[in-house]
Amino acid sequence: MTIALGKFTKDESDLFDIMDDWLRRDRFVFVGWSGLLLFPCAYFALGGWFTGTTFVTSWYTHGLASSYLEGCNFLTAAVSTPANSLAHSLLLLWGPEAQGDFTRWCQLGGLWTFVALHGAFGLIGFMLRQFELARSVQLRPYNAIAFSAPIAVFVSVFLIYPLGQSGWFFAPSFGVAAIFRFILFFQGFHNWTLNPFHMMGVAGVLGAALLCAIHGATVENTLFEDGDGANTFRAFNPTQAEETYSMVTANRFWSQIFGVAFSNKRWLHFFMLFVPVTGLWMSALGVVGLALNLRAYDFVSQEIRAAEDPEFETFYTKNILLNEGIRAWMAAQDQPHENLIFPEEVLPRGNAL
């Protein structure tokens, strides 16, 4: 039996190989296969947002001015969500709502679904870009894993939450003041600050900020100096063989401060990765729960006692009254189509009034 050994040669004109060679070529800005998703989606999402905040009104969906053309500034302009009556329609330009009319499409809130969907796929493309480039240079994929956390938050807040409610109307509009209003809405209708998933998210974000500050300061404090000159730190040389800072000195310092300290760099940096990523993932899970109208902590016994005893009130019961006030004022403003009217006697009043 004869066995022929040799290199298997593919057709040189193979389209996949040609594209792969061009897309993954070493250039100033890496493109890659992920770039086919990232660059068009990011371009359309940003372009839609700039177009909406510059020219498009929210009069037909929210009864608001929301563009620079109407007198808004950077903090008050927004690309607003579609009207509640449009439910979960994708609002395609060629769909039954706009019927190819670009002006009508903008008036109906079509730019919001356009920006939200292209933005979500653009973020996913950016995560895939990190994964693809890491494989190309033989790195671990932890950058991509870390970036999955803000993607989870974006998808849960802008897509999953309104999908669980009656329509895109209840998602945040794309603007600074608009998102502040959405946060107030979350507090009033879901008591979000008392939700344990929100607490984990806050602990993750603030804990990560603390870890970054401590880590940066510690590294600066323990840099190996390489002479007396102002610019003679060999740490600026990317090919240095020696360490940049003294882990041993840092370990001794924090051992004296706290009594405990990280003993190796792997555990230290994994912890710095773990804290914010886990916090953001937990908050994303919490928002998915809110999409299903799951409730946070309820201390009903305190509410009952506060209702019966005029002299008893806690910070919790005061916050519950605040939430009722937010709901009473916000519902009538945000949902004028519901014709909600709250007489004076049903508006919340604290025991102090």
UniProtKB/Swiss-Prot annotation:
Gene3D superfamilies reported in the protein's UniProt record: Photosystem II protein D1-like (1.20.85.10)
Residues annotated for chlorophyll a ChlzD2 binding in this entry: H118
Topology within the bilayer: Multi-pass membrane protein
Pfam families: Photo_RC
Entry keyword annotation includes Transmembrane: yes
Residue numbers bearing the N-acetylthreonine modification: T2
InterPro entries documented for this protein: D1/D2 (IPR055266), Photo_II_D1/D2_sf (IPR036854), Photo_RC_L/M (IPR000484), Photo_RC_L/M_CS (IPR055265), PSII_PsbD/D2 (IPR005868)
Modified-residue entries (Phosphothreonine), positions: T2
Keywords: Acetylation, Chlorophyll, Chloroplast, Chromophore, Electron transport, Iron, Magnesium, Membrane, Metal-binding, Oxidoreductase, Phosphoprotein, Photosynthesis, Photosystem II, Plastid, Thylakoid, Transmembrane, Transmembrane helix, Transport
Cofactor: record remark: The D1/D2 heterodimer binds P680, chlorophylls that are the primary electron donor of PSII, and subsequent electron acceptors. It shares a non-heme iron and each subunit binds pheophytin, quinone, additional chlorophylls, carotenoids and lipids. There is also a Cl(-1) ion associated with D1 and D2, which is required for oxygen evolution. The PSII complex binds additional chlorophylls, carotenoids and specific lipids.
Binding annotation for a plastoquinone: H215, F262
List of residues binding Fe cation: H215, H269
Parts of the chain that traverse the membrane: 41-61, 125-141, 153-166, 208-228, 279-295
Catalysed conversion reaction: 2 a plastoquinone + 4 hnu + 2 H2O = 2 a plastoquinol + O2
Example GO biological process: photosynthetic electron transport in photosystem II
Coiled coil regions in record: none
GO molecular function, one term: chlorophyll binding
GO CC terms, sorted: chloroplast thylakoid membrane; photosystem II
Cross-referenced NCBIfam families: psbD
Subunit composition and interactions: PSII is composed of 1 copy each of membrane proteins PsbA, PsbB, PsbC, PsbD, PsbE, PsbF, PsbH, PsbI, PsbJ, PsbK, PsbL, PsbM, PsbT, PsbX, PsbY, PsbZ, Psb30/Ycf12, at least 3 peripheral proteins of the oxygen-evolving complex and a large number of cofactors. It forms dimeric complexes.
Other facts noted in the record for this chain: 2 of the reaction center chlorophylls (ChlD1 and ChlD2) are entirely coordinated by water.
Family statement drawn from the similarity comment of this UniProt entry: Belongs to the reaction center PufL/M/PsbA/D family.
Its biological purpose: Photosystem II (PSII) is a light-driven water:plastoquinone oxidoreductase that uses light energy to abstract electrons from H(2)O, generating O(2) and a proton gradient subsequently used for ATP formation. It consists of a core antenna complex that captures photons, and an electron transfer chain that converts photonic excitation into a charge separation. The D1/D2 (PsbA/PsbD) reaction center heterodimer binds P680, the primary electron donor of PSII as well as several subsequent electron acceptors. D2 is needed for assembly of a stable PSII complex.
Name by which UniProt lists this protein: Photosystem II D2 protein
Annotated organism of origin: Vitis vinifera
Classification lineage: Eukaryota, Viridiplantae, Streptophyta, Embryophyta, Tracheophyta
Name of encoding gene: psbD
